[in-house]
Structures are given as C-alpha cells and as structure tokens.
Amino acid sequence: IHPSELKFQGDAFIQQVIKAANDTKIPCVIHLDHSGVKDIERAIRDGFTSVMIDASHESFEDNVAITKRVVELAHPLGVSVEAELGTIGSTDNDTEVAGGATNIIYTKPEEAVKFVEETNCDCLAIAIGTAHGLYPKGFKPELKLELLKEIKKVVNVPLVLHGGSGN
C-alpha cells in the first residue's frame, strides 16, 4: 500500500485489507511502500506487518540514521523493514507519487554492505536503472545487471527492485 493510498482510503479501508489478509490461508504481509517515519508509525499502529522506509533522497548518513530509527521501532513488534539505497528513476512528473527520482543514483556495493550492517534492515531496495511509472513507448531502461550481481555477492539480505515492470 502506498502512502497516498493510505491518505485517500483511510483507516476503515486498511482494516478491511488487514482482515482479508488475516483470514486467508495464504501467507502474506501488509506492506507500506515508499514511506516516511510518520506514515510508518501509523502503519505499525494499524497492524501492518512490513514497512518500507524511503530515505534514499537523504545523505547516506541520514538515510542510515532514519532507517535505524525505523528498524528499532518495527523489529520489537515483529514488523519487517525494507530500506532503499540509491534512487529509483521515475517516468512520472510527480516523483512523490511515483516514488522515484528524476536522476538515478546507482547503489554502490560497498555502501550497500555498510548500510545493511549499520541499519539491520530486512531487505534492501537498490538502484540499477529501473524507473517507476509507465514506460513511454520505445523507452528501454538501461539496467546495470552486473551491478545487481556485485551487490548480491556482498549483501546478505534479499534485494528488491522497484520499477521493473514498466507500469
């Protein structure tokens, strides 16, 4: 669930989603995507089981500090934390809604190692050239698959790729 959906739908809708998830026999999580600390606090209060702190537009040091704060809040309550390092591109003019950036800052393997070690995040969204939003006709993202392989070799948490579907 994206933060803009949280604001639009409100708590009653979220409670129905959580009830449906809890009633199914299929293992699932209720995940809050691309969020700040305030929305994450609300999501945890409401019963989400997974959150994504997106401080990727901050400095490396601030991203670490913010992510650590969220991990310290979430983990004691059994909530998993996804973080983002580097910036995902956006094909949308409204990058806040899209969750992307106008310029991609690729994730550096050595920073990914340090980030995961310092934050204790459960999974890491990395930037390898994907972009949020509908890809314009003829648009071909330039994916750095070797960078993905390098990061996978050195990081011990699952990696997440946002913006990979072109929609």
Per-segment meaning from a language model:
Residues 4, 10-27, 34-158, 167:
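Alpha/beta enzyme core
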Residues 162-164:
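Histidine-centered divalent metal-coordination motifs
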